[in-house]
Amino acid sequence: MIEIISALWPVFALILLGYVARRTGFPGESFWQQAEKATYFVLFPVLLVSRLATTDMSVVDLKATGLIVCLLVLMGSVFAFLVRPFTARDAAGFTSIYQGSVRFNVYVGLAASATLFGSLGVAVGAVVMALMIPLLNLCCVLVFSFFTHKTGKFSAIPLAIIKNPLIISSLIGLTLNQTGIGFPLVIEPVAELLSRMALPLGLLSVGAGLSFRVLLNSGVEICWASFIKLMLMPLSAFGLCLLFGLDSQSAEVIWLYAALPTATSSYILARQLGGDAPMMAAIVTGQTLISMISIPFIMIFLGFLQKSL
């Protein structure tokens, strides 16, 4: 228990620090957008390639992990549709509930998994991301298409998925690993320094994107989406990992990813495709704040449950 709390509190401390820094105008509004771009397009991809290329992937059960990820997305979708009568005020609002129920924050996930589980955490997390990001984007686009009836920008989504730097870097890292090429020794010291920058800057950017003002008008929606994403999803992940006989450490990484708050990019997708962007912003902020308590709690609870079985 102490180990989990000790490992996770710096992650959430950096998120809060990012929030405080932006609200106090430090180091300037223009900094945060550029910081997020640098993290997303350079620092995180370098981290993923370097870790995946050098990690022993024989300890990762790719088949079981893939099946668990697909089933988790399906279960999250079912949960979201089941609570629809109790939540969204309109069709656009439901798209925000849906995204809040299934998507996950990559920055928090990579930082927490690296802190808790080291290279194995990054490796399993990268496999989860490589599978889940395209699948979730496809599901979200289908939900938007059905509920908002907007088609103008949907053609750009497949290309955006293919060009996603996190997917590309995961595939490059896995290729270097599986072909035996490994990571080039010449650039390894540079990659190591860039990798160390990725997690703190990414977490600061998450905090900088939070806004408490948006929480005022979406209380019911935040509660339902958070209940699904932060409680039902990790419990479902626990059951699936048990069902497929996944090793304990890989299972813990999957629990963690299932328990993550929804992605900050959900707001952008809601704005682009006709969803309820203010509600989405409220869910992102609410879940990020709640997850500071829920993630340590659920990880400790599931760890205890696993040992008792």
Enumerate the language-model features and the residues they cover.
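Alpha-helical transmembrane segments of multi-pass small-molecule/ion transporters
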Residues: 1-309
